[in-house]
Swiss-Prot record:
InterPro entries noted in UniProt: GyrA/parC_rep, Gyrase/topoIV_suA_C, Topo_IIA-like_dom_sf, Topo_IIA_A/C_ab, Topo_IIA_A_a_sf, Topo_IIA_dom_A, Type_II_DNA_Topoisomerases
Site, Transition state stabilizer: residue positions: 124
Reactions that this protein is recorded to catalyse: ATP-dependent breakage, passage and rejoining of double-stranded DNA
Membrane topology: Peripheral membrane protein
Protein name, entry field: DNA topoisomerase 4 subunit A
Its EC number(s): 5.6.2.2
Protein's organism: Synechocystis sp. (strain ATCC 27184 / PCC 6803 / Kazusa)
Keyword Translocase set for record: no
Gene Ontology MF terms in the entry: ATP binding; DNA binding; DNA negative supercoiling activity
Length: 920
């Protein structure tokens, strides 16, 4: 019922409950419509829309200089948003933060806060401007003809009720807000996936939910993380409400002590946290749990995060099990948390809870209506312009008559009337002719007018088709979406782990956790944080566990948990053992995969795989078995190696510390459950001493004896009889004595070395270095024979300070090898052109480089008579996480001099880093 109007100053008696009901309803609707909930069309709340439009009016486009945030906030307050300045600035800051918005709409200059919930600098210090996506996908072409405008709070200005968004920002950046009696919580999504979903609905409006959810598999948070359970996503997308469990990204590292005699330590390293988790508060939570005695096994806790990304190191005590600590962190801290989804937004100024499909359909309807208004407005403008051009061309064609009229006309009005009568033009055309500059009479200007007239006529015809034919309009919409995807889309940051349980099973007190526990493989791709105003590198905060009282003679060597206090102090970053890069050289050899850097942990039930199953190892050194061979169609990550089990029960694993261990095939999990770091399956002594796995494979049958060729990082080589590994026990066997920090880099099974003869020329050992040098020698001639496991081998090749080994193989003197550099240059080389050398030599330079930064990446034997067609293709992985394939026949014969041919097209700043297994 409308409220009665009363004279000003009159006191009206009113029941309290009626006034409270009316006032509260007005307040509730004001909060719902005008403050807390976003519009489904452009995904913006009023404050965000007003900030964008105010900056658009100020001309703060991406190609213009930054402007002080205080100026922007002042314009927003004075023109459109009569609220507190701090609330407007807080909204502006969140639009800049790349950890709050998946696709920030504003670019910032200065300190805009951090993931630790550090406050931003005051608005008088920070500067901002529109981001390219805001200008190119939100505000382009905004005008009263395209979208509706309304008066501001005092009707002195006009503001848009919605911006002509070309992308559904409601899904891209998400939104959260608490209104009166309702709330919204929408997670961010990947732009490329959302565009694919929109195009899928355009092509097939009755697209099934299953097909739609394949195109948009789940949220994509700006801070990364792992989504564990797809059931929560399915429920949220279908009903508009649901819980999505999100887990931080972690891996296990073996940290080498800074002192010589200090022991290696195991640490859990967190590189990504769930969305909206405060890192500093999370670290304090862990510290509190440790001090309260609720979380045992942690000896040190520090934050090593810097501008390159997040890194929180949790060092463990020597007897602690990493998987047990990790499970407790999931259960007791926000390292695993649920993101509550509520798809609530305004539709026609009314709050509506929608499914994912409804949100996409609402946006498509809005975008189609906006395009229609845009085309109609452009058509009207073009028709008016075409009319004027037609008049100008008529005047130029009748130039003599035009001059005569102008010469004898008494005034402009008379001239206009005579032009209309003699040339048959309209009033507007007459005005255009009279206002035409004299330069229009020239021939060149006349041609320009004619060309513009032709182009306008064609555009008008196109616009009439677009307005009259909905299918053509939808084609234009799809073209627009594809263009925006190409311009703004990026890789997914949040990995969705299918089949992972969302619930964390509580561990009983004093229960020994399973040694096989591990979390799924992790790819950390944290984006660099915004550089702060403060100069220099940021200090790292370390939470150190210290005794609150000095130790006494009777005290135990290790402090009790109850006696531990946490103190915050800056410390240098942990010194990590760097894995030496080395490419794969033959099918039976695995390069030095850095298991220490990525050693994730999950629970699985041991089971024996079928005899025909396959084993595969990824670039993180994680292994799993699968019933069928992986191909490019069913593998979603590059592999270091893949081979058939062939009924074997034991796998031989050799670490870079030179020790071999047997691994039961039954201890390896199936790929359907997870991958497990190969190093983690080994005994604790191997996990403590080794940082990488140098070799994994099966022993040959006794009737086909083979020797084991071992080459260290410092260039020492030795042969070991294969029979030494036949009786390998659980305690392992030391294969090579390593001194002075040397590590085992290559290990491969080879045919036993026999003296060469005319009938059997024998095999040569070929070693390649990163500087492009090759050393070839005959093992029999130089006296390379099988030695005992305790021998340290002989110095095969002298290496320079910045040089490392990149390839080792056994080949016949008449064979050819393929060489490839990090910059993508390759060639085929005849080994006969490399002179035979001896132990301790530098070798022969066989590769030239196009730049000083380039290095030889790998050396492989040319596949002459290869049994598998896959072996004729080589795959390489780059520092930009791109996969490049090279065919064997692309390597052309070259001599020792020359760069070779450019075989791989690389982006700027991209270079190849490793060879991976080729998947057919």
């Amino acid at each position: 019922m409308a409220r009665k109007s009363f004279p000003s100053g009159q006191i009206i008696p009113t029941d309290l409950h009626e006034e409270m009901e009316r006032s509260y309803l007005e307040y509730a609707m004001s909060v719902i419509v005008g403050r807390a909930l976003p519009d489904v069309r452009d995904g913006l709340k009023p404050v965000h829309r007003r900030i964008l439009y105010a900056m658009y009016e100020l001309g703060l486009t991406p190609d213009r200089p930054f402007r002080k945030c205080a100026r922007v906030v002042g314009d927003v307050l004075g023109k459109y948003h009569p609220h507190g300045d701090q609330s407007v600035y807080d909204a502006l800051v969140r639009m800049v933060q790349d950890f709050s918005s998946r696709y920030p709409l504003l670019a910032g200059h200065g300190n805009f806060g951090s993931v630790d919930n550090d406050p931003p600098a005051a608005m008088r210090y920070t500067e901002t401007r529109l981001a390219p996506i805001a200008m190119g996908a939100m505000l382009e072409g905004i005008s009263e003809a395209i979208v509706d405008f309304t008066g501001n709070f005092d009707n002195s200005q006009e503001e848009p009720t919605v911006v002509p968004a070309q992308l559904p920002l409601l899904l891209l950046n998400g939104c959260s807000g608490i209104a009166v009696g309702m709330a919204t919580s929408i997670p961010p999504h990947n732009l490329g996936e959302v565009v694919d979903g929109l195009i899928g609905l355009i092509n097939k409006p009755d697209l099934s939910d299953q097909e739609l959810f394949k195109l948009i598999p789940g949220p994509d948070f700006p801070t990364g993380g792992h989504i564990l359970d797809s059931e929560g996503i399915l429920q949220a997308y279908q009903t508009g409400r649901g819980l999505i469990p999100v887990r931080g990204v972690s891996h296990i590292e073996t940290i080498r002590g800074e002192k010589k005699r200090s022991h290696n330590r195991t640490a859990i390293v967190i590189t990504e946290l769930p969305f909206q988790v405060n890192k500093a508060a999370w670290i304090e939570k862990i510290a509190s749990l440790v001090n309260d005695g609720k979380l045992d096994g942690i000896s040190d806790l520090r934050d090593e995060s810097d501008r390159t990304g997040m890194r929180v190191v949790i060092e463990l005590k020597r007897d602690a099990e990493p998987n047990a600590i990790l499970q407790k962190l999931y259960r007791m801290t926000p390292l695993q948390s649920n993101f509550g989804v509520i798809f609530l937004a305004l539709v026609n100024n009314q709050p509506v809870q929608m499914s994912l499909r409804q949100i996409l359909q609402e946006f498509l309807q809005f975008r189609e209506d906006t395009l229609l208004r845009q085309y109609e407005n452009e058509l009207g403008e073009n028709r008016r312009r075409l009319e004027l051009l037609t008049g100008l061309l008529i005047g130029l064609e009748n130039l003599d008559a035009l001059i005569e009229i102008l010469r004898f006309a008494a005034d402009g009005t008379t001239a206009k009337i005579q032009l209309q009568e003699r040339l048959g033009i309209s009033l507007q055309q007459g005005d255009a002719i009279l206002g035409m500059p004299m330069r229009r009479i020239t021939g060149l200007e006349r041609e320009k007018l004619q060309q513009e007239h032709t182009d306008l006529a064609q555009r008008i015809e196109q616009l009439e088709t677009l307005i009259g034919d909905r299918q053509e309009r939808l084609k234009a919409l799809k073209k627009e979406l594809r263009g925006l995807k190409k311009k703004f889309a990026d890789e997914r940051r949040t990995k969705i782990l299918q089949g992972m349980p969302a619930k964390i099973e509580p561990l009983p007190v004093n229960q020994d956790p399973l040694p096989e526990a591990t979390i799924p493989p992790v790819e950390s791709q944290s984006a660099p944080e915004e550089e702060l105003d403060s100069p220099g590198e940021p200090e790292q905060e370390q939470l150190v566990l210290e005794n609150s009282s000095p130790p006494t003679a009777d005290s135990a060597p290790e402090a009790k948990q109850d006696d531990l206090n946490l103190a915050v102090k800056p410390t240098p970053k942990t010194v990590k053992q760097e894995a030496q890069p080395s490419p794969e050289v033959i099918a039976t050899h695995s390069k030095l995969v850095s298991v220490a850097e990525k050693n994730p942990l999950t629970l699985f039930t041991p089971q024996t795989p079928p005899a025909e199953a396959f084993l595969s190892i990824n670039l993180q050194g994680e292994i799993a078995w699968h019933p069928e061979e992986l191909t490019s169609a069913n593998s979603f990550e590059p592999l270091d190696q893949q081979f058939s089990i062939q009924g074997r029960e034991t796998l031989i694993v050799i670490g870079d510390h030179g020790k071999a261990f047997p691994v039961a095939i039954a201890d390896i999990p199936p790929l359907a459950v997870t991958r497990i770091p190969l190093l983690q399956i080994l005994p604790k002594s191997a996990q403590r001493d080794a940082t990488t796995v140098t070799f994994q494979g099966f022993l040959p049958p006794p009737e086909q004896p083979q020797d084991l060729l071992l080459v260290s990082q410092q260039g020492r080589v030795k042969l070991l009889a294969g029979q030494e590994l036949q009786e390998l026990g659980p305690r392992g066997l030391s294969l090579m004595k390593l001194k002075n920090g040397d590590l085992l880099q290559f290990a491969q099974l080879v045919t036993p070395v026999n003296p060469a003869s005319a009938q059997n020329p024998g095999k040569n050992l070929v070693i390649a270095t990163s500087n492009g040098r090759l050393l070839r020698f005959d093992p029999a001639q130089v006296g390379l024979t099988c030695s005992s496991p305790s021998a340290q081998g002989q110095e095969a090749m002298r290496l320079r300070a910045t040089e490392s080994l990149v390839g080792v193989l056994m080949a016949s003197p008449g064979d050819r090898v393929l060489l490839l550099t990090q910059a993508g240059y390759g060639k085929q080389l005849d080994l006969a052109s490399v002179r035979l050398g001896n132990f301790g030599e530098l070798g022969t330079t066989v590769m030239q480089f196009t730049s000083k930064a380039d290095r030889l990446l790998t050396m492989v034997a040319a596949n002459q008579g290869a049994q598998s067609p896959q072996s004729s293709t080589y795959d390489f992985y780059s520092n930009q996480q791109r996969l490049h394939s090279v065919q064997a026949d692309q390597f052309q014969p070259w001599g020792k001099d020359g760069f070779g041919d450019r075989l791989v097209d690389l982006n700027e700043g991209e270079h190849l880093i490793t060879q991976v297994a080729h998947l057919g």
